[in-house]
């Protein structure tokens, strides 16, 4: 027999014409529902067709044969939208189809053709997203003979699942995606920077009550500067998620942790956190800024670093509005507009940061 989805067509032994009517299709459909498509190859045409069936062309009942050819495999995959979404669940059309670059004339096209042909309702997907191929660190295709493949299980065992997720999200998948131990090593460093930055914030929120946030008017301008930068990150991440530009999010979060937090804000605010009175207004203000930042980062990065962000979420303090069971059970934070500084004030801070960078560079040079 030929392997594949059978073509439900019969032929009249008398006139030789093909037969495919509503009546024959229903008979085949009922048979498949009961016994599966293999029944087509196991049963004779007379056992499939209704009793007393006659040829719609010549009107005779001289016997019938079945079509032995099968449908192209793309018809199978192109029909999955009906079986998986439209028939039972009612989720048709899909939010997104995701596949490799070669599927424009493959799965995407066959799905479109079957949907339009069967229902006349347009594409079975709202959007389709394509990606390049996974290659080694030098851009070469992976082959066992070359020994340049990377086993995901090895990445799990050496670095954890979040590192593999970070690799997938960090790459611009519109082009070929490089994969090597060196790349995972660099990503592990980025991951540790994110984790250690969040750990620092967690350590300094041990005695903080998130129900008692410092009001914007009582907050030092430096803390409001941080939250304004956080607002920018929220807006960029939200747009990037909507556009499926995950690499923009990973790079933006890394830049925020390295430059905005570690190299600037946290370096300055340590004195307030460590040296001022536990209940001092300026210390509580810094804790408010840290809490809102950590609260946002754990949600914002959870789709990528799922396990790490949930670990952070379980360890941090919460308000009654949070679902403390798991970070993904909560909605993403919106920008904290009440704390935002105006553009003129932010521009002045950019000048301050630029001067600080020059001075720090001169100090490092003098120490050398």
Which residues are covered by each model-predicted region?
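Structured secondary-structure scaffolds
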Residues: 1-208, 226-269, 273, 288-301
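Acidic, turn-prone loop/beta-hairpin segments
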Residues: 10-13, 64, 208-235, 267-368
């Amino acid at each position: 027999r030929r392997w594949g989805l059978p073509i439900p067509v019969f032929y009249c032994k008398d006139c030789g014409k093909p037969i495919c009517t509503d009546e024959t299709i229903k008979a085949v459909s009922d048979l498949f529902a009961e016994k599966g498509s293999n029944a087509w190859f196991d049963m004779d045409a007379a056992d499939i067709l209704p009793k007393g069936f006659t040829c719609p062309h010549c009107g005779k009942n001289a016997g019938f044969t079945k079509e032995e050819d099968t449908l192209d495999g793309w018809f199978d995959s192109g029909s999955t939208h009906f079986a998986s979404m439209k028939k039972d669940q009612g989720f048709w059309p899909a939010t997104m189809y995701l596949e490799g670059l070669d599927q424009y004339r493959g799965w995407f096209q066959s799905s479109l053709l079957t949907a339009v042909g069967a229902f006349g309702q347009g594409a079975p997907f709202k959007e389709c997203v394509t990606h390049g191929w996974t290659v080694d660190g030098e851009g070469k295709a992976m082959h066992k003979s070359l020994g340049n493949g990377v086993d995901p299980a090895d990445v799990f065992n050496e670095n954890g699942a979040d590192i593999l997720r970070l690799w997938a999200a960090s790459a611009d998948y519109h082009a070929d995606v490089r994969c090597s131990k060196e790349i995972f090593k660099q990503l592990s460093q980025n991951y540790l920077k994110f984790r250690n930055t969040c750990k620092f914030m967690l350590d300094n929120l041990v005695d903080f009550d998130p129900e008692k946030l410092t009001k914007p008017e009582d907050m030092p301008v430096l803390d409001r500067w941080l939250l304004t930068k956080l607002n920018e990150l929220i807006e960029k991440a939200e747009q990037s998620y909507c556009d499926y530009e995950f690499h923009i999010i990973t790079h933006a979060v890394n830049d925020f942790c390295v430059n905005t937090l570690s190299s600037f804000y946290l370096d300055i605010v340590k004195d307030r956190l460590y040296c001022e009175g536990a209940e001092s207004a300026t210390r509580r203000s810094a804790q408010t800024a840290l809490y809102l930042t950590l609260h946002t980062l754990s949600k914002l990065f959870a789709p990528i670093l799922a396990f790490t962000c949930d670990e952070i979420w379980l360890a941090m303090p919460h308000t009654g509005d949070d679902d403390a069971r798991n970070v993904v059970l909560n909605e993403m934070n919106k920008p904290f507009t009440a704390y935002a500084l105006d553009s003129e004030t932010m521009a002045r801070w950019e000048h301050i940061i630029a001067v600080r960078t020059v001075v720090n560079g001169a100090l490092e040079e003098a120490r050398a």
